[in-house]
C-alpha cells in the first residue's frame, strides 16, 4: 500500500502536465504569404532622359519604372501595397422547431381469438397494449459581428484578367500578448481610389483576427476535452 501511495503523486503530476499541454492554437485561415519581393525592373539607358511631357522615373536603385501621365498612383504591379479599409458588419439569425407525436393501441381477447373455444382454458383472458411517442424540439441561434479598421496588403500576383491577388498582415502588441490581423483576397483595380479599397469590394476575402497571448490560450479548448465532448452521448 505504501508503494502505491508513493506512485500517486508522480502520476498526478504527469497527468496535469499532459492536460495543460492539450490546448492547441487553431491554424491560421490565411495560408498564403503575407508579402512578396517585387520583380527586378530593367535599367533605363542613360540616353533616355526626361522631356517636357515624358518624365523618366527611377527608384532608389536606379532602375526605371513607367508611370502613366494621366493616371493616379495606384497599385498595379507585384510588390505594390494597397490600403484596405475594413468595414465588415454581419447579422444572422436562425430559428427552427419540430413537433412529432404518435400513439398506438392494440387489444386482444383470447376466448374469441380466431373463433377457437379457448374460454374454458384461459377463463376470459384479455390482452391489451398501448404505446405513445412524442417529440418536441426547438432551436435558435443569432450572430452579430462588427469589424472596422485599416490594413495594408501587398500584391502577390496579377491574374490574367488584370485583378490583383493581395495578402497582408498587421501585428499589434498589447501588454503580454499580440494581436494578429490577416487579410487575403482578390481586388479589381477599378475599385481602387487613392490607393484605397473597401473590404466589401474584396472578392474571396479571408479576414482573420486572433491573438497569441494567455487570454487566447484560456479561450481555446484542449484536444482532450474536445475528444470527450465528441463521444459524450449527453
UniProtKB/Swiss-Prot annotation:
Entry-linked PROSITE patterns: PROKAR_LIPOPROTEIN (PS51257)
Signal peptide: 1-16
Location of the protein in the cell: Cell outer membrane; Bacterial flagellum basal body
Lipid modification (S-diacylglycerol cysteine), residues: 17
Keywords: Bacterial flagellum, Cell outer membrane, Lipoprotein, Membrane, Palmitate, Signal
Pfam family, one: FlgH
InterPro entries cross-referenced by the UniProt entry: Flag_Lring
Predominant localisation class: membrane
GO biological process: bacterial-type flagellum-dependent cell motility
GO molecular function: cytoskeletal motor activity
Membrane topology reported for the UniProt record: Lipid-anchor
Lipidated residues (N-palmitoyl cysteine): 17
UniProt family annotation: Belongs to the FlgH family.
Functional note: Assembles around the rod to form the L-ring and probably protects the motor/basal body from shearing forces during rotation.
Quaternary structure and partners: The basal body constitutes a major portion of the flagellar organelle and consists of four rings (L,P,S, and M) mounted on a central rod.
Protein name, UniProt field: Flagellar L-ring protein
Organism whose genome encodes this protein: Nitrosomonas europaea (strain ATCC 19718 / CIP 103999 / KCTC 2705 / NBRC 14298)
Record lineage: Bacteria, Pseudomonadati, Pseudomonadota, Betaproteobacteria, Nitrosomonadales
